[in-house]
Amino acid sequence: MRRVLDALYMGCGIVGAIFLALIAAVILYQVFGRTLGYGIPGVDDLAALFLVATAFLSLAYTFRAGAHIRVNLLLHNLSRPQQRLAELWCLIFGAGLMGFLTYYTAEMAWESFVYGDRAIGQLPILMWIPQGAATLGLLAFTLSFLDDFAAVLQGERPSYEKATEIDVQGQG
């Protein structure tokens, strides 16, 4: 199960990075097109949809890598058992919140699929496609919260602490 989850997080991160590169590619294409005197319709629409995929698909990977912003001021002033309880509370709260968002994003994507909703803009892209990417990213993010919750519950450190420790020591 560990390998499957790690592959999911890594896969989402890779796909998010690919969409980030695609944003750069379509924007450069538009800039050079305008320089040469021809407009390219729909590039802004594509860049916006690629941004949705980049942002949501990268959430779980960056969380596991310890790249999300965390405020540890309170945790450092607690005893070790209190730190563990606070960590567990934050992880289960985050999992619940992300689960809520995942459910409603999936419901919205399903309704868009059923009704054939299309983007308003120069490119009438089916809305369930970017909404589906957002749902997949949120699902992976929810799983990463639950994954770390299970780890902390078993007495291990969460992935984001392990990742930042390795990086600080220059081994990452």
Where are these regions (language model features)?
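Alpha-helical transmembrane segments and membrane-interface helix-loop junctions
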Residues: M1-G172
